[in-house]
Amino acid sequence: RRLSLGLIGVLLVVGLLLAQTSLWLFELGLRSYLEVGLRNEAESLLVSIERGSKGLQLDSQRLIPSYSRLFSGYYYRVEAVDQVWRSRSLWDHELVKPDYPGLQADLVQGPKHQQLLVLRGDYRRFGQPLSIIVAEDYSPLLSSFRRVQYIGLGLGLAALLLVLFLQRLTVRNALRPLDQARQQIAQLQGG
């Protein structure tokens, strides 16, 4: 029984550490991949800014349709010196400018309780400084991670139970000759 409890403890700790580490590494890779996409979106927004008769203008014809669909999960905010452009998809939600450029470490609360992965890029266009903030809904990925964690936990527990069952079977088979010897000793003592 002590052997079983020790084995359970070790397998549980090692299994949980491996599962969490692999999920963490997978999420880091996924965030890195999504960062590239967000940078591309920011650069697409940058080249969509043109010089017009009234100063800088954002050519909305060059943007992806998701920016026009309400709560689509794809959002932007472009800040120039004297004007701000926002995606229609934000509706009345305010996408706050992060304190520093680059991919933000923490997710940001978005419209309709979405968890947003946010990137801020600082650029210059036609000699004017611009801050471009792009965001993508990360909520579906979070729910997928949770689902994978639950499935992994279930599979880990099933594997643990299987290992314990096999261990008991192996120990019982290994001790069978000793049980036979104990029975023979009892018969000899009984006469």
What residue ranges belong to the model's regions?
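Extracytoplasmic ligand-binding sensor domains of the Cache superfamily
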Residues: 47-48, 56-113
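Short amphipathic alpha-helical/adjacent loop interface patches that line ligand
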Residues: 42, 138, 182-185
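A short beta-strand signature within small-molecule sensing/ligand-binding domains used
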Residues: 112-124, 130
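Helix-start (N-cap) segments at beta->loop->alpha junctions
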Residues: 126-127, 134-154
